[in-house]
Amino acid sequence: MPSLLISVLFLHIAIYIINTIGASTIDSLLWLIYTKLPTSASCMAREQHQMKLEVVQLKREMNATSSQDEFAKWAKLRRRHDKALEEYEVKNKQFSRFKSLFDVAVKALRWAGTSGLILLLQFWFSKTPIFTLPPSWIPWQVEWVLSFPRAPMGTVSIQVWGGACAVMVALVGEAIGATVRYLYGSKDSMEAIKVGAGAVEKEKKRQ
């Protein structure tokens, strides 16, 4: 089944990308995007930000006011600050609770769309061969391993194909990462050489 073969491959690529970037980084990015949309979360985020600015502003005014020379003004600012701080803490708790629910939902959807979907495919298509091997191409013992656990003999099961995809994607990802690091390292080395050569030329001109 070519479609199943490609689907499993792309799922493992998606899992590798998520693990490489970091699930927490992706969650933070999704939360940032979500709070920019016209939703209740964006309204709550704006209210929280405004309350925080108000608390900070009142705190600055309090610090700039003498509690001895301008006690009445200072006391009024103190009451306003305490009230604003209390309202901010209530709003911040609501916002944090909403964000926690969002993180749980994102984690559940991410697992269901990647690892959970792979497990479902492996269970549902456990008897379906990914592709068929040529007859008498390899020993029957190897054929049995490749068809494990429930695919017909002489075929490759979805479990074996999934494991091969995971290994292949990891190796390719490591190779790409090593290449990028090498290229950036070479670029930094060339810049260091150029800087060193420029310093030598300047020193020669001074002499």
Curated annotation (Swiss-Prot):
Membrane topology: Multi-pass membrane protein
Chain ranges on the Cytoplasmic side, renumbered to this chain: 25-110, 173-207
Role, per record: Required for the post-translational delivery of tail-anchored (TA) proteins to the endoplasmic reticulum. Acts as a membrane receptor for soluble GET3, which recognizes and selectively binds the transmembrane domain of TA proteins in the cytosol.
Keyword Calcium in record: no
Biological process, per Gene Ontology: tail-anchored membrane protein insertion into ER membrane
GO cellular component, one term: endoplasmic reticulum membrane
Similarity field: Belongs to the WRB/GET1 family.
GO molecular function: protein-membrane adaptor activity
Domain of life: Eukaryota
Protein name: Protein GET1
Chief location: endoplasmic reticulum
Xref: HAMAP family: Get1 (MF_03113)
Disulfide pairings: none
Self-association state and partner proteins as the record states: Interacts with GET3.
Coiled-coil residue windows: 44-97
Membrane-spanning ranges: 5-24, 111-131, 156-172
Annotated gene: GET1
Keyword terms: Coiled coil, Endoplasmic reticulum, Membrane, Transmembrane, Transmembrane helix, Transport
Side Lumenal, residues: 1-4, 132-155
